[in-house]
Swiss-Prot record:
Function (record text): Catalyzes the NAD-dependent oxidative cleavage of spermidine and the subsequent transfer of the butylamine moiety of spermidine to the epsilon-amino group of a specific lysine residue of the eIF-5A precursor protein to form the intermediate deoxyhypusine residue.
Pathway stated in the Swiss-Prot or TrEMBL entry: Protein modification; eIF5A hypusination
Active site: 292 (nucleophile)
Species name: Methanosarcina mazei (strain ATCC BAA-159 / DSM 3647 / Goe1 / Go1 / JCM 11833 / OCM 88) (Methanosarcina frisia)
Alphabetized GO MF terms: deoxyhypusine synthase activity
Family affiliation: Belongs to the deoxyhypusine synthase family.
Recorded name of the encoding gene: dys2
Pfam families membership: DS (PF01916)
Protein name (database record): Probable deoxyhypusine synthase 2
Length: 345
C-alpha cells in the first residue's frame, strides 16, 4: 500500500485498563479531536514548567469557583505551576466567601427562579448561593477597605492586602487569594469593579472612603512582568478580560521599545468558537498577527468545558511533576527600577 508524509503516524485506540491520569493523557496523544488536544495541553504545560527562566501567567474567567474549581487553582499556585494570576473579580469574591467558611450549594438549572428569589437564593446555572451571605461578604469587603484607609493602589496590591486579611481571620489554606499571598504570586483583577468586591468598595465609597484602585498601574505592573521575564507562557481558562489583559502586555512592551518575542507557550480551555470574532474564541494563530504570541510558540487551544478540563489536567500535572524542582520566578516590587525578578529553585 502506498504511504506518504501524511500517513506516517497511525492513531492508537484507547485501551481500558488500570493506569494513572497522566498515563491516560499520554495515550490520548495518539487519538483525535478534543481528546488529543486535551492531552497536548498537558504535554505543553509540563514542558513549559521545565523551561528555565520562564514565567507562567494564567487568565481565569467564568464562574470557576462556584463550580468547585478553587482548590485546583490554589494547588496550581502553591506548586508554582502558575506564577501570576489574572482573574475576574467574581472568582476571587467567591473564593474569599468560601475561605471564610461560607458555601455554594448543589442546585439545578431547572429550578423555579422566581421561587429562588423569594427564598433569597441566587442561581449560577446549577449551583445555588445564599444572597444574605453574599451581602454580608460585600459589607465585610467595605469594612476591610475602611481599615486600609485612603490609599491609591493597584489591584495586585489590594489583593495582597486582602490575602493578608483573610489569613488574619483564619481563612482556609486552600483559598486562591490566601495561597497567592503566602507564595508571592501576584493577582491582577483588571475589572475589579465588575464584581461583588467592587460592590463592597462602592459601599465604602458611599460611607466617605476615598480608596482608588489604579487600573493603569495594573497595566504597567503586569507589563513589567513580561518585560523582565526570561520567557513567558500563558494558560487561559475561558477568555474575556483576563485573556486580553495578559495578551496585550506583549504589544505594550513593544510600543515602549522593548524587544519581546511574544508568549512562547500558549494554552487555552474554552467553549467559545473563533468564527464569532470574539476574543474568548480567538485562535493563537490570530494572536501571532498582533505580536502577542510568538510565531514558533507551542500553541494548544482546547474546545472544552473548563470544569471538565481543569481537574483532569491538574491531576496529570501533579503526577508528571512529582519530585521535580522548578526554577520559579521570585517577584520583588520595591526595587530601585520597579519590579525585579529572580529565578530560584
Amino acid at each position: 500500500m502506498h504511504h506518504n508524509v501524511f500517513t506516517n503516524t497511525p492513531t492508537i485506540p484507547i485501551d481500558v485498563k488500570d493506569r494513572s491520569v497522566s498515563e491516560l493523557m499520554d495515550g490520548m496523544l495518539r487519538t483525535g479531536f478534543q481528546g488529543r488536544k486535551l492531552a497536548e495541553s498537558v504535554q505543553a504545560w509540563s514542558n513549559m514548567l521545565k523551561e528555565k527562566d520562564t514565567t507562567v501567567l494564567m487568565g481565569l474567567s467564568g464562574a470557576m469557583v462556584p463550580a468547585g474549581m478553587r482548590r485546583v487553582i490554589s494547588y496550581l499556585i502553591r506548586e508554582r505551576m502558575i506564577d501570576c494570576l489574572v482573574s475576574t473579580g467574581a472568582n476571587l469574591f467567591h473564593d474569599s466567601h468560601e475561605a471564610l467558611g461560607r458555601k455554594h450549594y448543589v442546585g439545578s438549572h431547572l429550578a423555579n427562579d422566581e421561587k429562588l428569589f423569594e427564598h433569597g437564593v441566587d442561581r449560577i446555572y446549577d449551583v445555588f448561593a445564599v444572597e444574605e451571605e453574599f451581602r454580608n461578604a460585600d459589607n465585610l469587603i467595605a469594612d476591610f477597605a475602611e481599615e486600609i484607609g485612603e490609599i491609591s493602589c493597584s489591584s495586585r496590591e489590594f489583593m495582597y492586602l486582602l490575602g493578608k486579611e483573610l489569613v488574619r481571620r483564619g481563612a482556609a489554606e486552600d483559598s486562591i487569594v490566601v495561597s497567592a499571598y503566602r507564595h508571592n504570586v501576584p493577582i491582577f483583577v483588571p475589572a475589579l469593579s465588575d464584581s461583588s468586591i467592587g460592590i463592597g468598595l462602592t459601599i465604602a465609597r458611599r460611607r466617605g472612603l476615598k480608596l482608588e484602585i489604579d487600573q493603569i498601574k495594573d497595566v504597567d505592573e503586569i507589563t513589567q512582568i513580561v518585560e523582565k521575564s526570561g520567557h513567558t507562557g500563558v494558560v487561559y481558562v475561558g477568555g474575556g478580560v483576563p485573556k486580553n489583559f495578559i495578551q496585550q502586555t506583549e504589544v505594550i512592551a513593544s510600543i515602549l521599545g522593548m524587544d519581546v518575542p511574544g508568549h512562547e507557550y500558549a494554552i487555552q480551555y474554552t467553549s467559545d468558537s473563533p468564527h464569532w470574532g470574539g476574543l474568548s474564541g480567538c485562535t493563537f494563530d490570530e494572536a501571532v498577527s498582533w505580536g502577542k504570541v510568538a510565531a514558533q510558540a507551542k500553541k494548544v487551544q482546547v474546545f472544552v468545558d473548563a470544569t471538565i478540563a481543569l481537574p483532569i489536567v491538574a491531576h496529570a500535572l501533579h503526577e508528571k511533576t512529582r519530585g521535580v524542582k522548578r526554577t520559579a520566578p521570585v517577584f520583588s516590587w520595591d526595587g530601585p527600577e520597579g519590579l525585579e525578578i529572580a529565578y530560584n529553585e
